[in-house]
Amino acid sequence: MNLKVLFLLAMVLVTLCLGEDRVTDRRKFCKCCASCCVSGRNIDGDCPPHGNQQFCHFCNREKVKIKRDCRSNQTAYQHCMEYHIQCASVKNHVCTDQ
């Protein structure tokens, strides 16, 4: 009986720790994307010609939402992922220290 309780407690702790890591990573990533939106306006890099402008246009409308609640803003996170895939070299250049 004690082993079952210990096992369940261990599983809960592991789940909480992994969940917090995901939230932290996501928060950092959203912060990075918001920064890229501001800093990336004049950076062409390896982006497609329209990639940066599209993201910045989205960010201008959603910037407050991204910064305020990136954990639950699925649309912002999705756009961040698209931006990350399209403009990885620019993102890494702008956001290496964040």
Curated annotation (Swiss-Prot):
Q: Which domain of life is it from?
A: Eukaryota
Q: In which tissues is it expressed?
A: Expressed by the venom duct.
Keywords for the protein's UniProt record, in alphabetical order: Cleavage on pair of basic residues, Disulfide bond, Secreted, Signal, Toxin
- One Gene Ontology cellular component annotation? extracellular region
State its location(s): Secreted
* The UniProt record lists the keyword DNA-binding: no
What positions belong to the pro-peptide in this record? 22-28
GO molecular function terms here?
toxin activity
Q: Where is the signal peptide?
A: 1-21
Q: Does the keyword Secreted apply?
A: yes
Q: How is the polypeptide modified once translated?
A: Contains 6 disulfide bonds.
The domain section of the record reads:
The cysteine framework is C-CC-CC-C-C-C-C-C-C-C.
The family note in this entry says: Belongs to the teretoxin C (TC) superfamily.
Give the protein's recorded name.
Tan_12Cys
Which species is this record about? Answer: Terebra anilis
